[in-house]
Amino acid sequence: MNYKKLSLLILLFSAGLMNVAAQKSPQDMDRFIDVLMKKMTLEEKIGQLNLPVTGEITTGQAKSSDIATKIKKGEVGGLFNLKGVDRIMDVQKQAVENSRLGIPLLFGMDVIHGYETMFPIPLGLSCTWDMTAIEESARIAAVEASADGINWTFSPMVDISRDPRWGRVSEGSGEDPFLGAMIAEAMVMGYQGKNMERNDEIMACVKHFALYGASEAGRD
């Protein structure tokens, strides 16, 4: 399976388009993805990579906002920082009912150290060396976030930072790669479980791209 198929598989699995979750086998899933991708234009495929920040949308605005126009054209794959079941349902309805292919949106948020229940920052959690507790904190965050319509978190952060002046050092697990790797594994398991079959699990997105934590003089 190529990367395009894999990306779309994740999208469809998490969103439940046309009851994909009920597919019986990987072969069925591959066929479903092949058929859908053959229907997509290049613009629609690129649109699946678009993740606008739209936290300002309120209930009732989705139909008239600029983002609604883009959703109808298939130019949006997900929304970032949109919170609230009513608002998410309002926007999702636009995608499913008014876009050409009816592909539902992903809804992502920086669920870094809890969602409604706040836990210590990742740097603080790392000091415990308690992988069971760390995994449980991510599990609780996933349950709460998924109940609010969120299905994608940009966590854990695995940047190794050895300069405390860097403003994002609190989001990571410190300067030890071994500890950071253990914590990342625990958090991913807490967020999405073993196979993401439950509706109270969310996708984890390990970040950031290579060497982002190797800042100079603490500058981001």
Describe the residue ranges of each PLM region.
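Glycoside hydrolase catalytic-domain context in secreted enzymes
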Residues: 21-220
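Bacterial Sec-dependent N-terminal signal peptides
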Residues: 1-25
